[in-house]
Amino acid sequence: VNVKFSDTISLPPAEIFDAIVDHVKMSKYFISGANSSIVEGRKIMWEWADENAEEEIHVHKVEQDKLIEFEWSATGKPTTTVISLEPADTGKTKITIQESEWDNDEQGGKYAMQQMRGWTDFFNSLKAYLLFNVNLRTGERL
């Protein structure tokens, strides 16, 4: 089972890419902390203090302003996540996230739905941060 979905933000790819790879910026909308920014070949620990959770990601590939690929085990099973950015209409960027792969059974379906919810939260929180300077995790204006 795989999940793949897209959304558009009215900003250029470079600005969105920076908000995703920079751990200080990412902690203003998605995670509560990390020990590093996203860099190809690096192992990074992401933390969600409000969920009392942390997860190590293994960054496989980074293409400036275009692509981030990493492996993690957020559902207890290793999966690969690919975040791709491409210019859309003038001044907009299409973001596509694909995560794979879970077993093709009921539990795999549950994991996929759980991650789809998480990535939907990511999209919404990224937009709120970049467009309105709001952290949806805390409800605070930054």
Predicted regions and their residues:
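Hydrophobic ligand-binding cavity/cleft-lining segments
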Residues: V1-N35
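Aromatic-glycine hotspot motif
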Residues: V1-S10, D89-T96, L136-R137
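Generic structural detector for well-ordered beta-strands
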Residues: K4-S10, M45-E47, H58, S84
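Generic recognition of short, well-ordered alpha-helical interface segments
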Residues: L11, V21, E54, Q114-R117, ...
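Hydrophobic pocket/interface hotspot
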Residues: I16-I20, M26, I44, V59, ...
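A solvent-exposed, acidic/Ser-Thr-rich amphipathic alpha-helical stretch
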Residues: G33-R42, E55-I57
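Hydrophobic-ligand binding "helix-grip"
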Residues: A49-K92, S100-D103
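A conserved amphipathic terminal alpha-helix motif
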Residues: E101-L142
